[in-house]
């Protein structure tokens, strides 16, 4: 099938892109030059995300510029200037110190898109605590796993979420010393405190300690196909990549109105929902509400958004809604739409151009990379369906594994292989928390192996093929089969469970579970609904399966490992491939 091309014409730019000559910028790029554009801590005391994102603006001429504009579910609009954000994050940093939080201690946030989360993140980085955001849609079990594995010392959450999802777990979380409730005016217990009350007593003056660029700053959990969720560790130096990609990919500049729709529990919601926009001194739109097509069009218009960063799932939901921006909806301020989360189909790219007046630019990266690695840029031609070209400073390639386990780069265009990156960019994860061995397996022959299959065409554009493992991408979430299977087999009826992702046009993949039953149970619709509810209660709606199918037995290897690959092939009617290790063969 002939691939389409969207050509960019410079005459159409009312505001010229920050990156106009891709090849020249790549050739002359250096991370040292990027670092030289930032302040660093006074007196050469290092590099700190909180300082670069807020304090260098709060202490200068832009102090009263709007940093955050929060839109509540019920219509309240609250603005926070850089100066106010600086003072509030100082209060939070002082509060952490008062509560005994030390450098490197993990502070978790479970509260959705509320101003307190953004203030807390910045306060953590200033105080040298480690910020660890979680999806508020998680159920008790995923929360407990991540708090335990992350050695959570303090948790920021709402009173409702605490009572429903955290309080029942407290006996299993001995390392959790304090809980701060963002919406409670009174303390619930000695260790369950009202955040507003505590902040009111804290000083709004704080000096950021000396910060090594390699000091741990962020912990993001990402699911694995086996075992527990992996905690990807990122450091303060990551801000260099957030700054560079904010300029070259998101085309951010001071004074822009910017809206990233991602939840902070997802790495996009932290890297590009907090850090990158504030580094560039924009007004960062924070919408508390979930997806609503009319509301989203209204925000784009009323807030005069210049740059919009969203997800393919949301784009496809807008497409399926059938709604088009009304005649009164003014999108003339919008100059760039970027998308990430799963591959963006060509139809969606072209729909953006037809309905919104701009093509949608796909880009690719992972929790482990910490920032955008491959992208379509505002000034470069788009090949709908392609993830684009590597960022300046990033070397990407296609590699294939040899029989001896080593890897070699594939130079020939159009050959499928694993997408790999040369290590060393600033936002690259530094380890998996408590799992250095697993971290080492991600690297071979000076390549970081992404686990994604792709091809590269003759012009250097990369094209996504599929996952090299069993990770399920659903609505932008990374779901590990093992986590879902583990929850299902806690039900007395379930003997075994195998979980796959089934392609679904709107959300990317739908989580489907295959289960076998214990002897005293029989398949029925009633039991199926019971299991769906059971899993949803434990895992939350973001992770729980949407479909369950009963089987008499699951395909397994002779060693007892469930062959999810075979389950998926049978579900999709695809060739089963090598079944030599299948039990009973």
Q: What name fits each language-model region?
A:
Residues 2-11, 98, 122-197, 311:
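Structural core segment of the AMP-binding/adenylate-forming
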Residues 141-148, 153-159, 301, 308, ...:
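AMP-binding/adenylate-forming catalytic core of the ANL superfamily
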Residues 196, 305-310, 319-382, 395:
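Gly/Ser/Thr-rich phosphate-binding loop
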Residues 397-422, 455-459, 522-528, 563:
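Conserved beta-loop-beta connector loops within the AMP-binding
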């Amino acid at each position: 099938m002939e691939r389409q091309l969207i050509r960019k014409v410079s005459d159409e730019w009312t505001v010229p892109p920050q990156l106009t000559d891709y090849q020249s910028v790549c050739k002359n790029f250096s991370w040292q030059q990027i670092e030289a554009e930032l302040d660093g801590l006074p007196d050469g005391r290092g590099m700190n995300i909180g300082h670069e994102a807020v304090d260098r603006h709060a202490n200068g001429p832009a102090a009263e510029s709007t940093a955050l504009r929060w839109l509540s579910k019920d219509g309240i609009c609250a603005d926070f200037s850089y100066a106010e954000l600086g003072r509030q994050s100082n209060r939070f940093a002082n509060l952490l110190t008062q509560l005994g939080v030390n450098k490197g201690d993990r502070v978790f946030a479970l509260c959705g898109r509320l101003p307190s989360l953004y203030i807390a993140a910045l306060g953590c980085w200033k105080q040298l605590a480690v910020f660890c955001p979680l999806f508020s849609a998680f159920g008790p079990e995923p929360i407990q796993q991540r708090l335990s594995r992350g050695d959570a010392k303090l948790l920021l959450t709402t009173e409702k979420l605490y009572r429903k999802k955290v309080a029942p777990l407290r006996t299993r979380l001995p390392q959790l010393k304090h809980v701060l409730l963002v919406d409670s005016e009174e303390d619930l217990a000695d260790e369950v405190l009202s955040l507003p009350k505590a902040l009111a007593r804290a000083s709004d003056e704080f000096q950021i300690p000396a910060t090594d660029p390699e000091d741990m700053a962020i912990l993001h959990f990402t699911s694995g196909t086996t075992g527990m969720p992996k905690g990807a560790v990122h450091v303060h130096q990551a801000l260099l990549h957030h700054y560079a990609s904010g300029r070259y990919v998101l085309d951010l500049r001071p004074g822009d109105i910017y809206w990233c729709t991602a939840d902070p529990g997802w790495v996009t919601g932290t890297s590009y929902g907090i850090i990158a926009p504030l580094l560039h001194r924009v007004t960062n739109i924070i919408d508390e509400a979930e997806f609503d097509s009319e509301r989203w069009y209204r925000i784009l218009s009323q807030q005069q958004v210049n740059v919009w960063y969203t997800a393919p799932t949301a784009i496809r939901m807008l497409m399926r809604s059938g709604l088009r921006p009304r005649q009164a909806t003014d999108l003339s301020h919008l100059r760039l739409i970027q998308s990430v989360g799963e591959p963006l189909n060509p139809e969606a790219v072209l729909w953006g151009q037809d309905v919104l007046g701009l093509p949608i630019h796909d880009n690719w990266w992972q929790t482990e990379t910490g920032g955008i690695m491959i992208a379509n840029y505002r000034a470069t031609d788009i090949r709908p369906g392609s993830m684009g070209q590597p960022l300046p400073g990033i070397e990407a390639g296609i590699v294939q594994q040899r029989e001896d386990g080593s890897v070699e780069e594939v130079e020939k265009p159009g050959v499928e292989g694993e997408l790999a990156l040369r290590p060393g960019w600033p936002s690259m994860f530094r380890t998996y928390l408590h799992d250095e061995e697993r971290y080492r397996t991600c690297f071979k022959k000076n390549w970081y192996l992404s686990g994604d299959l792709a091809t590269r065409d003759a012009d250097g554009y990369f094209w996504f093929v599929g996952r090299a493992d069993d990770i399920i991408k659903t609505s932008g979430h990374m779901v590990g089969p093992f986590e879902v299977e583990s929850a299902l087999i806690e039900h007395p009826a379930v003997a075994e469970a195998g979980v796959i992702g089934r392609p679904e046009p709107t959300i990317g993949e739908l989580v489907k579970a295959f289960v076998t039953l214990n002897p005293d149970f029989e398949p029925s619709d009633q039991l199926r609904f019971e299991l769906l509810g059971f899993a949803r209660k434990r895992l939350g709606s973001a992770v729980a399966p949407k479909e369950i199918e009963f089987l008499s037995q699951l395909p397994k290897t002779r060693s007892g490992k469930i062959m999810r690959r075979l389950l998926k092939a049978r579900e999709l009617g695809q060739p089963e491939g090598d079944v030599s290790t299948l039990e009973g063969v």
